[in-house]
């Protein structure tokens, strides 16, 4: 079940975040009983979280954007980037809030070879740091790949903010070892051993 870091939240905020997290989890959860799902090697797995489903729902999109924006404001971050289809809706949700200080960027897998030939699309200030957004931090491989691409392109990445942290994995530690702060709205304490899986971070 999802849980959250309660140290800086009021009782009402904790309840609101728990309720939002449960809705995100319930709508994102896909089980093998419902459809065939596989890991990157093509082997069947028991479940995964497809956060694109709830994040492309208008109501949850706005609610999550408001929560992410508040976390970013508390850390002084106003430039956000996303790498991959799980992250792109998060970037857009932050930009949909009333705070017009936010700027967003979408990170490509490789620099575009024509046109403006950019790795990162969006109106970002290249001299200011960015915060990487992602839906899930699991092993940290996806976030590490995004970090390498961004650093190679000259960007300073100061932190990683995700919806879910899979607490049984070491992804957050892996990213912190790169000198970034990490934060997740919710810790996922569920473990399903061999049948666990996610196509994200």
PLM regions: where:
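A generic structural signal for well-ordered alpha-helical segments
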Residues: 72, 95-99, 150, 175-176
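PRPP-dependent phosphoribosyltransferase catalytic core
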Residues: 2-26, 147-201
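Short, glycine/charge-rich flexible loops or terminal/linker lids adjacent to PRPP-binding catalytic cores
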Residues: 85-131, 138-145, 197-199
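Phosphate/pyrophosphate-binding loops at sites that engage ATP/ADP/AMP, CoA/4′-phosphopantetheine
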Residues: 68-78, 151-153
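Active-site-facing substrate-recognition patch
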Residues: 2-73
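Short glycine-rich phosphate-binding loop at a beta-alpha junction
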Residues: 76-86, 161
């Amino acid at each position: 079940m999802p849980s959250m870091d309660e140290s800086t939240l009021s009782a009402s905020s904790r309840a609101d975040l728990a309720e939002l997290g449960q809705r995100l989890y319930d709508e994102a959860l896909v089980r093998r009983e419902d459809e065939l799902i596989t890991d990157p090697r093509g082997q069947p797995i028991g479940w995964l979280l497809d956060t694109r489903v709830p994040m492309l729902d208008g109501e949850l999109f706005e609610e999550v954007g408001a929560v992410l924006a508040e976390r970013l404001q508390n850390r002084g971050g106003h430039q956000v980037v996303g790498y991959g289809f799980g992250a792109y809706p998060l970037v857009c949700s932050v930009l949909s809030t009333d705070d017009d200080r936010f700027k967003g960027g979408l990170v490509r897998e490789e620099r575009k070879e024509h046109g403006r030939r950019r790795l990162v699309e969006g109106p970002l200030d290249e001299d200011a740091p960015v915060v990487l957004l992602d839906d899930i931090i699991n092993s940290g491989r996806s976030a590490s790949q995004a970090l390498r691409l961004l650093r190679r392109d000259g960007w300073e990445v100061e932190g990683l903010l995700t919806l879910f942290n899979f607490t049984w994995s070491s992804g957050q530690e892996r990213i912190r070892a790169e000198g970034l702060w990490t934060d997740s709205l919710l810790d996922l304490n569920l473990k399903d051993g061999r049948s666990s899986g996610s196509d994200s971070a």
